[in-house]
């Protein structure tokens, strides 16, 4: 009896077992993206902490984004790699719940953090003379803390609401992670409409409210850029905000597709490829998007390498 109970408390994650010839390729790509994510985001945090020239609100928020991305990917990639190397993965319910909580918390925190970064850029471009007074270190800490707290709150709320829904057998997930839309597909019918509507409303708030803030912020930036007289300032503003918009489009496009559709319409086979993009690919691209054309970050990297070289020569 105990064995039967423990079997019922596990989820079978099929991952990409329907495409066996694709699994070795995906394994290599996912591992490469994961290494790029850890390396790129760690380097970004190191540079921002060590170089006084990067002690500004923009890089403070970028550090938090780097930490979110590294944690978000780490909550997903290890079981995904295990799944790609072998047969379908059996995951205990406790592990599944922990993964769901972590990915929801970090993904939600990223939604809010991207909105905070958009507000920061709008303040820098639209109010350059008052920027230092508006965006104080205390405000930066408050906004960053609010991003993490919002993510944690949404994660706890969504997980608690999901726990109210009884899940029907077989507990088979055509996915590589315990993602909310895939788990909702297993929920039994009946009295769950109210709970599901509450969960959907929470997802709308955590996704669309920050997205609206982002659109409004970059609308204000666009108006300010059009009024600029100097082409140099216009190019800097467009370059900085353009990189932010690229990251926003990559993340929000796939996240909105995944989370803002009814559970009945959710296609697991298509959904796992979309999820692969925003959980693995986007975190690997973010350090490149934000730093590839950033002269301050490149300068900080050169200074760090020179200091390390002098240290080695001194020994």
From Swiss-Prot:
Ranges per topology, Extracellular: 1-24, 79-99, 158-195, 260-272
Gene3D superfamilies per the UniProt record, alphabetical: Rhodopsin 7-helix transmembrane proteins (1.20.1070.10)
Gene Ontology cellular component annotations, sorted alphabetically: plasma membrane
Domain of life the protein comes from: Eukaryota
A single GO BP: detection of chemical stimulus involved in sensory perception of smell
Disulfide bonds: 96-188
Membrane topology type: Multi-pass membrane protein
GO molecular function: G protein-coupled receptor activity; olfactory receptor activity
Function: Odorant receptor.
Protein name in UniProt: Putative olfactory receptor 2I1
Gene source species: Homo sapiens (Human)
């Amino acid at each position: 009896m105990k064995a039967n109970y423990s079997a019922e408390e596990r989820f079978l994650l099929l991952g990409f077992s329907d495409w066996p010839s694709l699994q070795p390729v995906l394994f290599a790509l996912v591992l490469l993206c994961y290494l790029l994510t850890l390396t790129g985001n760690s380097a970004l945090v190191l540079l921002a902490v060590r170089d006084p020239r990067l002690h500004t609100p923009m890089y403070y928020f970028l550090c938090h984004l780097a930490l979110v991305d590294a944690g978000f990917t780490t909550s997903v990639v290890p079981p995904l790699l295990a799944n790609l190397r072998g047969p379908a993965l059996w995951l205990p319910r406790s592990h599944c719940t922990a993964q769901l909580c972590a990915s929801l918390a970090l993904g939600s925190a990223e939604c809010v953090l991207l909105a905070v970064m958009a507000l920061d850029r709008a303040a820098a471009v639209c109010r350059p003379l008052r920027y230092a007074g508006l965006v104080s270190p205390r405000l930066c800490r408050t906004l960053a803390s609010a991003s993490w707290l919002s993510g944690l709150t949404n994660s706890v709320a969504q997980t608690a609401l999901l726990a109210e829904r009884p899940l029907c057998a077989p507990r088979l997930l055509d996915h590589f992670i315990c993602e909310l839309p895939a788990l909702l597909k297993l929920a039994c019918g009946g009295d769950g409409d109210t709970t599901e509507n509450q969960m959907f409303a929470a997802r709308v708030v955590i996704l669309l409210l920050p997205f609206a803030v982002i659109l409004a912020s970059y609308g204000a930036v666009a108006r300010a850029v059009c009024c600029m007289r100097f082409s140099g300032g216009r190019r800097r503003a467009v370059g900085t905000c353009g990189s932010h918009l690229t990251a926003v489009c990559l993340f929000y496009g796939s996240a909105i597709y995944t989370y803002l559709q009814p559970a009945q319409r959710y296609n697991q086979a298509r959904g796992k490829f979309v999820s692969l993009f925003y959980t693995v690919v986007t975190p690997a691209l973010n350090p490149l998007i934000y730093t590839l054309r950033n002269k301050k970050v490149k300068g900080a990297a050169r200074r760090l390498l020179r200091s390390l070289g002098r240290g080695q020569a001194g020994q």
